[in-house]
Amino acid sequence: MSQHLVPEAKNGLSKFKNEVANEMGVPFSDYNGDLSSRQCGSVGGEMVKRMVEKYEQSMK
């Protein structure tokens, strides 16, 4: 299991992951063994994209 830089952020990141997956139509659950690498990667990529956009907006 991976370790988070900020352990307190784990719940927030899980919630964010589920929100993004739902918006993209990817059926995330506690067990994601049925999902393709492409589906998982697209959710993770979208999460990173949104986090970077949010950070860039805060820099303005």
From Swiss-Prot:
Annotated site (Cleavage) = 19-20
Q: Which domain of life is it from?
A: Bacteria
Protein keywords = DNA-binding, Sporulation
Q: Which InterPro entries match?
A: SASP_alpha/beta-type (IPR001448), SASP_alpha/beta-type_CS (IPR018126), SASP_DNA-binding (IPR050847), SASP_sf_alpha/beta (IPR038300)
This protein's record includes keyword Thylakoid? no
Molecular function per GO:
double-stranded DNA binding
Q: Record's Pfam families?
A: SASP
Q: How is it modified after translation?
A: SASP are degraded in the first minutes of spore germination and provide amino acids for both new protein synthesis and metabolism.
Q: Which GO terms describe its biological process?
A: DNA topological change; sporulation resulting in formation of a cellular spore
Where are the disulfide bridges? none
Give the family from UniProt: Belongs to the alpha/beta-type SASP family.
The protein's role, per its UniProt record? SASP are bound to spore DNA. They are double-stranded DNA-binding proteins that cause DNA to change to an a-like conformation. They protect the DNA backbone from chemical and enzymatic cleavage and are thus involved in dormant spore's high resistance to UV light.
The protein in question is named Small, acid-soluble spore protein C2
Species this chain originates from? Clostridium perfringens (strain 13 / Type A)
The organism's lineage is:
Bacteria, Bacillati, Bacillota, Clostridia, Eubacteriales
